């Protein structure tokens, strides 16, 4: 019974599991990783600072009932092994393995059976004893809508009840970067002053975006006055389709994000 359920759910990730169920199954995972600038990452002061930041973030997430847990070495190795051996996962051959504490984690993430080839537009993963060859392709946004909120990212997994959905494993990364409060405030004030000058010129009557830009920077300055601030946001989409389905999956990813008013384009030479 367990094997039948597993087969049923695995099939639903790429195709409708039954004619009467036109849906796609999803096993979604969410990870949060924080990068803290430091000159000496191995210093005790830097580690204490990182532990303090982690404690604050865990407490904040608990307030919103996310109940996060801190990764250990085993979870780190298994998660990255799943990403770096996609051909094993797609062929149904990937499995958990015990972590060797005597070896560095980075030496245990890529299987000995995995062959990796770097191409201009992607990375090829293959194994000698498995038929499906996987090509990892990266896409990045080159245009965002005028107004965008994080809740719209709920559509990023595709329409599970429609025809527009990923039929291969995918990884969506959201980058959030925040500068120091004082630097951000000074930058917002300078940009706001410049935008206000441009919006007061005669040419602003013919270019409505100048008025909108002034309004946006005015709101940014007000956010700093209320103790808030600004963040820089970007996304990257990685898809892991079989080589024969790359074109279809790239167009699917572009279509999904286009419904969110985000224009994606395929990356080249990302490995450099």
Which stretches of residues belong to each language-model region?
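Extended, folded cores of ATP/NTP-driven motor/assembly subunits in large transport
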Residues: 1-272
């Amino acid at each position: 019974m367990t094997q039948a359920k597993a087969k049923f759910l695995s099939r639903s990730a790429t195709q409708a599991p039954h004619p009467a169920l036109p849906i796609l199954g999803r096993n979604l995972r969410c990870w949060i990783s924080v990068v803290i600038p430091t000159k000496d990452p191995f210093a005790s002061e830097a580690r204490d600072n990182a532990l303090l930041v982690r404690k604050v973030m865990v407490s904040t997430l608990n307030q919103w009932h996310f109940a996060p847990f801190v990764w250990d070495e085993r979870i780190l190795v298994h998660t990255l092994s799943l990403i770096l051996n996609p051909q094993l996962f797609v062929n149904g051959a990937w499995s958990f393995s015990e972590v060797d504490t005597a070896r560095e984690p980075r030496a245990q993430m890529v299987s000995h059976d995995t062959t990796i080839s770097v191409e201009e537009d992607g990375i090829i993963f293959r194994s000698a004893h498995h038929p499906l060859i996987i090509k990892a392709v990266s896409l990045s946004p080159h245009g965002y809508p005028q107004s965008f909120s994080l809740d719209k990212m709920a559509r990023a997994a595709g329409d599970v009840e429609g025809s527009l959905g990923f039929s291969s494993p995918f990884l969506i990364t959201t980058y959030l970067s925040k500068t120091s409060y004082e630097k951000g405030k000074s930058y917002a004030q300078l940009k706001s002053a410049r935008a206000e000058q441009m919006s007061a010129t005669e040419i602003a009557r013919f270019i409505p975006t100048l008025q909108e830009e002034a309004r946006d920077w005015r709101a940014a300055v007000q956010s700093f006055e209320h103790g808030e601030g600004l963040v820089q946001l970007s996304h990257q989409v990685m898809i892991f389709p079989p080589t024969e389905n790359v074109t279809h999956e790239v167009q699917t990813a572009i279509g999904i994000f286009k419904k969110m008013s985000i224009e994606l384009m395929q990356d080249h030479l990302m490995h450099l």
